[in-house]
């Protein structure tokens, strides 16, 4: 009897497949992406490599040493303190504690602060509170800390917002009115996100993560791109990540354009250039998981789309890898075997520059991804590599080479805890455990500025406040 391997369906249910069936599913998934996106399918060698990763005997797998990449985040600390029947585990804790847990306990390379609703519009009435939280977090943390939220243009429609719901208008055949409603909502989305980030950047935020961009279709993408453009013009040094909501931009409007390109119907490799033109530093492409298909089918499909996006993008690509995207099952507690295999495949086959950790419980998401492919933050040199990706738009190899040269170590040493522990203490750039007298928070980041020849926004704020 042929050997069967334990794998998953897109909803997380365990299934058993033979090697021949795995390869058949991989080829079908890759072909689906190639057909839809009009892009190259995976080669035979790449299919073989994916099959090899899927059939590895261990429950958890990881990238080859030296191939580690930085991680960014969606949903911030909500996976710890949130409790809405979703992926939050309901631990009563402050957001400062949550952010520091990601930095000190999970080995995150970057982190983000976010409002419990995790959308920009609800932040407006409480922006002063968000600014306070950001400043306190920046005073205590070393890794890059973003403000993260969803553009979520749907909140601008009735009953939550001022503009009539375009879906209702379309049902009444009021097409022109529906278009105008979407255009007004997009303008307000741009205005609100820019205003909020003006406040947060003045409070020391390293930058912004636009998460789940285009969830409300092409109008959502349009408003976000214009927000990125405005922020880049006003704040040349702001770190900006744009993570998408889905693999294709839905044409809710259909006629909206950016830089002469119609937004409706764009696939990841076509979205990348527009995100770069708007002024982002990092692009977060997405491929949705089909819950009725197998994990090999979903993974090959995702890798095919993302590989092409990485190839054509001028920006570092941090693929979104939460539950229900990137070949990962749609389950609040994502299976560790599926998460680590998808993480490894995205790095080794798709060639991504980083992983954007998405929705899922702490063990199933940040811990699994960081164990599989992360650089482990201030345990090693992950925060330094991430800073160069965002400061100079460096792809992963260039960023690693730059940091290694500054530290006078081999690239392989950047994820070596033994090498970096001693070196970080010697350079006084922050260590993960408590060392009396060692630089922490702002002091450590000021030393990082000198080491990497970059400017860090929270340090600039400190100098402004102290007149130094």
UniProtKB/Swiss-Prot annotation:
It comes from Methanosarcina acetivorans (strain ATCC 35395 / DSM 2834 / JCM 12185 / C2A). One of its GO terms (molecular function) is dimethylamine methyltransferase activity. Pathway: One-carbon metabolism; methanogenesis from dimethylamine. Signal peptide: none annotated. Catalyzes the transfer of a methyl group from dimethylamine to the corrinoid cofactor of MtbC. This is Dimethylamine methyltransferase MtbB2. Belongs to the dimethylamine methyltransferase family. Keywords: Methanogenesis, Methyltransferase, Pyrrolysine, Transferase. Its EC number is 2.1.1.249. The gene is mtbB2. One of its GO terms (biological process) is methylation. It is an enzyme of class 2 (transferase). It catalyses: Co(I)-[dimethylamine-specific corrinoid protein] + dimethylamine + H(+) = methyl-Co(III)-[dimethylamine-specific corrinoid protein] + methylamine.
């Amino acid at each position: 009897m042929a050997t069967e391997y334990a794998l998953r369906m897109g909803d997380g249910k365990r299934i058993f497949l033979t090697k021949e069936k795995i390869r058949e599913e991989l080829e079908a998934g890759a072909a689906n992406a190639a057909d839809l996106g009009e892009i190259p399918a995976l080669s035979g060698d790449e299919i073989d490599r994916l099959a090899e990763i899927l059939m590895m005997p261990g429950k958890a797998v990881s990238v080859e040493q030296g191939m580690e990449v930085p991680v960014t985040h969606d949903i911030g600390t909500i996976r710890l303190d949130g409790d809405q029947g979703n992926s939050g585990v309901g631990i009563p804790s402050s957001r400062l504690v949550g952010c520091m847990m990601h930095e000190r306990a999970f080995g995150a390379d970057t982190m983000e602060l976010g409002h419990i609703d995790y959308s920009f519009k609800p932040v407006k009435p409480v922006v002063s509170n968000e600014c306070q939280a950001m400043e306190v977090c920046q005073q205590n943390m070393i890794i890059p800390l973003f403000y993260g939220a969803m553009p979520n243009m749907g909140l601008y429609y009735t009953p939550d917002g001022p503009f009539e719901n375009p879906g209702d208008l379309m049902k009444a055949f009021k097409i022109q009115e529906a278009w105008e409603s979407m255009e007004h909502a997009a303008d307000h989305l741009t205005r609100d996100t820019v205003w909020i980030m003006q406040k947060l950047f003045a409070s020391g935020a390293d930058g912004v993560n636009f998460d789940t961009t285009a969830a409300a279709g092409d109008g959502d993408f349009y408003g976000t791109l214009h927000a990125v453009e405005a922020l880049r013009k006003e704040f040349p040094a702001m770190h900006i990540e744009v993570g998408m909501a889905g693999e294709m931009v839905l044409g809710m409007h259909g006629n909206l354009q950016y830089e002469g390109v119609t937004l409706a119907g764009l696939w990841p490799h076509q979205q990348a250039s527009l995100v770069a033109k708007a002024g982002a530093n990092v692009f977060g492409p997405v491929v949705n998981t089909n819950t009725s298909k197998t994990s090999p089918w979903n993974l090959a499909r995702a890798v095919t789309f993302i590989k092409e996006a990485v190839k054509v993008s001028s920006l570092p690509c941090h693929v979104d890898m939460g539950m229900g995207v990137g070949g990962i099952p749609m389950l609040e507690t994502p299976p560790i075997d599926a998460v680590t295999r998808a993480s490894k495949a995205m790095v080794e086959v798709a060639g991504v520059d980083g992983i954007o950790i998405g929705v899922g419980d702490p063990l199933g998401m940040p811990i699994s991804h960081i164990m599989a492919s992360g650089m482990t933050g201030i345990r090693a040199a992950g925060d330094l590599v991430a800073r160069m990706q965002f400061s100079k738009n460096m792809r992963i190899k260039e960023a690693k080479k730059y940091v290694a040269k500054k530290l006078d170590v081999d690239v392989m040493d950047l994820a070596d805890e033994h090498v970096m522990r001693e070196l970080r203490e010697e350079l006084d750039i922050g260590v993960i455990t408590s060392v009396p007298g060692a630089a922490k928070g702002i002091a450590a980041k000021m030393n990082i500025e000198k080491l990497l020849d970059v400017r860090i926004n929270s340090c600039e704020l400190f100098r402004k406040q102290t007149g130094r």
